[in-house]
Every structure is written in structure tokens, then in C-alpha cells.
Amino acid sequence: MNDYRPLTTEEIEQLQQNGCWAEDWTSVNVAEDFNPEHMRQVMLYGEVCIGSFDKSIEVSPGFHKHSGIRNATLHNVIIGDDCLIENIGGFINNYTIGDECYLSNVSTIETTEGATYGEANVISVLNEAGDGNIISFSELSSQLAALMLKHSHNKEFRETLFQLVREYVSSRLPERGLIGNNVKIANTKEIINCIINDYCEVNGAERLSDCTLLGDATSSVYIGTGVIAENTIIDHGASITNGANLQDCFVGEACQINNSFTASASVFFANSVMSNGEACAAFCGPFSASHHKSSLIIGSQVSFYNAGSATNFSNHAYKMGPIHWGILERGTKTASGSYLFLPAHIGAYSVCLGKTMAHPDTTSFPFSYIIGEGEKTILIPGRNLVTVGLYRDINKWPKRDLRPAEHRKSIINQEWLSPFVISKATEGRRILQELCTTCGNQCQEYHYQGLTIPRSSLLSGIRFYDMLISLYLGQVIKKATLPAAAEEEGQEYTPLSEQAIHNGEEAWTDLGGLLLPQALESQLVEGIIDGTTEDIESVINALSEAHSHYADFNQAYAFSLIRQLYEEATPAAFSLIETRADEAKSLWTEAIRKDAQKEYDLGDVDEDTFLHFANSISPAT
């Protein structure tokens, strides 16, 4: 911003000749090289500072207009250099505007008393009728929000963490609204109590109230026609367009929300895409997608998720209100017309079909089909492992991360073969084996915690989980530096630390895309409660630090599993693991080809498409 000086008598006279008026000309200050020729029909109230008008502004591709202020009313405003402000139907009140901005055909831009800009807004996610469990602020990430959500029942933790966020926000909250450099705002009705960062664009919006738009030259925010957003923070690279309506939301990096999608008290992170439908009290982690008008995501936590058309959840059980919620672990899909009666907890990379009423908990059965069929909930364990859909998903997500390297607050570990999933599959295999042993081999159906498992599905489920474990262990052995291999290649072998081994061998968790040992999460929670973690930056750094050691923790878990299955982690065991992994890869890729062949045989896919996919399947995936 400039150093501003008072207007000269000559400048005041020229401004008056141009149809300008000031409540008090002595309260108007300008840049040293200010040119009054470029101000016409401007009403000035309160303290106003105006920059220079040397450049032209590109208002549309190839169409430039000289900077200046025309047909506007300003009150307590600071304006940087080379801005074009024209046709302000109402007024601009209590705002600071940066350099080279274009503001045209806007009704009102104003900061009022008590403005929060969407910062430190507490919302209730999952339990629609519950106390607020996520506090929104500009540095919110998927894993930090997941941590808040997971431990919201711990009052001491919640209050302490919320206070750390409030301290962070209060130290940075401006006294009035800010519009950064190179911002475009056009054809928009109301912007009230908003911070709009550099290079953001708002075109045709209905109303933005108490919002923060985060952006810079590498990754800006775009707000389009008909959008209404209230008490919402919109992160770098996101776009909200075509009549979307947001209230009490956080929209993360590179998210797209459009086509009249409506959301309240919901958070969306990293590359999520929401169109046409509705979300309420929803946690949508990285790569969540819903494209259909008839789909409702309510009271649910999802990530790497795809909602089929007419997907619906119910968070009312009877008459106690919308207090129930569910978790669909990473990679889950809901098929067209599916209905899930909450509470429910669905295992990773599963597919829900039909109307599921039995409140299933399938966390120990990843990669499954969960089928609602009348009063029954049928479980087909592990079936999704050998489908075209899974293969396409695990290969497409890495290619669809649209965030620039500078703006990746949400940590996304895209490993589909991870301790988090493998530990669940190992437990699932044990349960299936016990059911087979306990109930005998002659049963046509097995029953487990309200789930019905057909005999053939139980037996194939055991095989699928054996395949999965072999794939995982083979992958880890391939990547790990083993003592014998290091010696043979003349490399220095650095063993895992005792701490890495201890943490990696224990239970694992998924915090909104961050895979880490449960022990590290517990340590972080304890540190927040006892005050050893003193500020929100330390919390964020601790999560990043946990991610940086994933490879060591992963290897520690894998070696622990090897000792369980092979007694010792010896060269002979490693050789056997590699052999079994190669066999599993061949079986897995062949099963996926057969799954694709089914669709081709039905005549639903042309030959070229089928052959292109079949030839693209890599056994090394």
C-alpha cells in the first residue's frame, strides 16, 4: 500500500467538476502520483485513501479498461494502485482493497461490527443435533478436523484445542474486511464481512457473508453465478459455482462445489467434488464425490468416497431427533439407490447396495459388498478387491490431486495397501476362519453381529484376504532395505528405531487421509490436554511429522505381521513372501481382467475400450 497525502486544491476542484463529492475533503488522501481525471461520479464519506491510476485492467480476455473509480459510494475505504471500481449500486464501507483489483456492478461490500470472516466458527458435524465439534479456521486440514471429530467427547481436549485455534485466529483477525491484490468482483449483490485473498474472483454471486477466500497467484478461489455462502472458509484452488448454497462450511483445497449443491454444517477437503445434491453435518475427506440431485450425505464421515445416484442416509432412528451418525472408511462407495440407516460403520474400500437397516459394523471386513435385502444385511467379504472399480479407483486418485505443491495442508496418504487396512483384513480373515470352524462346513449361511454371510462368500473371503496380505507383504519387502541386501550392495544398513518399531506394531488409524499408528494420535491428544503442545502450529507440525515417518512405521508393522505368520523375519521367509506375492499379483490382475470381461460379454463395453483397459492392467500396481 501507498504512503498517502492530502488532496491539493486543484485536485479537489477537478474532482468536483467530474461529479465527485466528499463529506470532508480533508479526510480524503491519495497516492503521490494520483490523477483525478480517472474519478467520476464518486461519493466519499469518512476516511478514504486512494491509490494511483497508471495502468489498465483486463476486465475480460482481450478487453482492457483504464483503472479508475466511477459511479461509486465509498465510506472508510483504503484503495491500492491501479484499481478499476465502477458501478457500485450501493456502497463500499469499511474495507481495505489491494492493487490492480476490478470491482464492477456490485451492490454492497461492507464490514460490520463483530465480523468474524468465518474464522473460529464452531459447527456440529456428524451429530446434527449435537454440540459443536469442529472449529473452522484458515489452517484447518482434513486430519486436524478428523482429530477434533474423533475426540470431541473428551471435553478437556475439545476446550483446549478450540482455545488454541481461537488464540491463533485472534492474533490474525483484521479490524475490517480485506480484498487482496488482483482480485475480480463483478455482477455480485452482497459481500459482507469477507476476506478475499489475492487473485480470487467472484462473478455473479448472490451473497457472501462472513467468509474467507484463500488464494494467491498459484492457486486462487473462484465463486460463480448464484452462489450463496455464509460463515464459510474456502481454501486455495476451490471453486463454488452455479447456484451452490453453503452455510457453516469449510471447503478445502481444490474442491469443486456446483450445480445448486446445498450444504450446511459440513466440511469438504482436498479434491472433493459435490454437484446437484445435498450435504448436512457431513465430513467429506479427500476425494469425496457426489454428482446427483437425489443424493444426500448426512451425518456421515467419508473419504475417497463416491455416492451413487439417489444415495440416502437416515440419521433419525425414531423420535429422539437427528442424533445418529455413521462412518464409511476410505474408499467406500454407495451404489445407486442405496440407503443406510445410521448408526453404521462400513469397512474400507467396500460397496453398499440396497436398503441397509441393521446398523452394520463391517470394519473388520474391508473390500466387501454390504447388501441390504429386506430384513437381512448380506456381507460378501473381500469381494471388491477383485473388481474393475477398485483397480480404477486406486490408480485414478493419485492423478487427480489438483492442488499445487505450495498448498497441500491436508495430508493424503494414498497407499491402499497399508497397515490400517491390512490389520482389519487380518482380523476379518480370523473371524471368517473361526466361523467356519465353529459352525462347521455344512452351513449354507453364517451369521455374525447381524450380518449374513453365504458359505461360498465366506470361503472366497478367506482367499481374498490371503491374497491381500500377500500383496501387502510383497510390496513392503520390495521397498524395504534388508540387512542382507544392503551388505550385498555395499550399502550401510540403518535399522528401524525402537520407537518406530513400537509405534508401527500397534493399532493404526486413518485421520482424514493421514495413516498413522494409534499411539502417535494418543500422544498428540495427551500433549494438547496437558499443555505440552502449546499452540496450533505445534499440532499441525506433529501431524506432518507422523506422516514423514510412515515408511518406517509401515515396515515395522509388516515385520511384526511376518513374525506372526512365518515365526521369524528371515531371508527364507522373505523369499517365500516374494514368491507368494508374485502369485497373488497374477491371481489379482487376472481376476480384474475377468471382471472387465463380464462387462464386455454383456455388450455394455465396446471391444476397443475393453482391450485398452485389459492391456493397461499392471501386475506391479
Language-model segment annotations:
Residues 6, 10, 14-22, 30-53, ...:
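Glycine-rich hexapeptide-repeat left-handed beta-helix
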Residues 25:
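Conserved short histidine dyad/triad with adjacent acidic residue
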Residues 68-70, 74-80, 84-159, 186, ...:
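Phosphate-/polyanion-interacting regions in eukaryotic proteins
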Residues 165-179, 185:
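A charged, amphipathic alpha-helical module
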Residues 179, 183-202, 210-221, 226:
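Core alpha-helical transmembrane segments of integral membrane proteins
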Residues 373-621:
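Long, compositionally biased intrinsically disordered regions
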